């Protein structure tokens, strides 16, 4: 029996497991079992996190769904869920070491898919940083702090920062001071100029105070609990709530260093196989294949699931062609948005309509595989 072990309880891991389990029986009668390893008991719909930190906007059950229940249709002979954290990988021995309730558990594999994702450089509400309970508590804490704050600064003007500032300003733009700090000359740097211009205008319409070409040093906590930031121009900014949205780190600490690039991302070839590691593959944010964006992860998941089935059927896998087209869509408050496909700017009304709910209705269908 072939044992496929998948690491990660997010989009990469859960979607790949479902795609394989739903389709493998159509192509081969070879015996198999899938084990999904996740440090999170629940799937976190972090696409909606910028709105989720605002009190009363999104119920907890629309942000989190239990993973194991979503796989109940396959039966224990075909699927097993392991709640634990990957701590070590023995490529030669084809063994993964997982910390399960403080105990080191060794899991052997024939194929290993690493879809462990990434985390923010500074722990916050946008990605899980260890457990479902932990990120739930973080979101609840942020909701309380957002409610109480009179001045909020968002540092980092990439998509997460812009969406977060937009959501906050839509709700509180006339009652709280919302500041967005960008280290570059505009927001959404390296995106088409027409998109950055539109985003900037939409933010300003919502009363966001956008500071460009500005760096902020790590904040100092004052005796009253407020944060003091020293900006690159020398200005000292005192705020009630500091929200960092810059930088991600791959969750690859368990992978031997020879398989990682200088930034800690897993190096893969055109088949998503980890370079130099037979039978080990990596997709999504943890790999060096494409930008860490949802639609790229979906494409990669489809491809790796098909290749796994081909391998079990004794057929050659097919190479993946990475996308050379940049794309983005984001909501800026509930009534505006912008985005692009390549150099083509997407109409704001289209982005707003598509992203109106931040896709929370797709969470249950993603976890149980019914929308794949």
Curated annotation (Swiss-Prot):
Domain of life assignment: Eukaryota
GO cellular component: cytoplasm
Induction (UniProt): The cluster is expressed in rice fermentation medium. Three regulators are located in the cluster (ptaR1, ptaR2 and ptaR3), suggesting that the production of pestheic acid is controlled by a complex regulatory mechanism.
InterPro entries given in the database record: FAD/NAD-bd_sf (IPR036188), FAD/NAD-binding_dom (IPR023753)
Reported cofactor(s): 6-hydroxy-FAD
GO molecular function: electron-transferring-flavoprotein dehydrogenase activity; flavin adenine dinucleotide binding
Record: glycosylation sites: 251
Protein's UniProt keywords contain Cytoplasm: no
The entry's keywords: FAD, Flavoprotein, Glycoprotein, Oxidoreductase, Signal
Binding site for 6-hydroxy-FAD: 8-12, 51, 285
Gene3D superfamilies linked: 3.50.50.100
Cofactor notes: Binds 6-hydroxy-FAD non-covalently.
Pathway: Secondary metabolite biosynthesis
Record carries keyword Secreted: no
Main function: Oxidoreductase; part of the gene cluster that mediates the biosynthesis of pestheic acid, a diphenyl ether which is a biosynthetic precursor of the unique chloropupukeananes. The biosynthesis initiates from condensation of acetate and malonate units catalyzed by the non-reducing PKS ptaA. As the ptaA protein is TE/CLC domain-deficient, hydrolysis and Claisen cyclization of the polyketide could be catalyzed by ptaB containing a beta-lactamase domain.
Family assignment from sequence similarity: Belongs to the FAD-dependent oxidoreductase family.
The protein's name in its UniProt record: Oxidoreductase ptaL
Organism annotation: Pestalotiopsis fici (strain W106-1 / CGMCC3.15140)
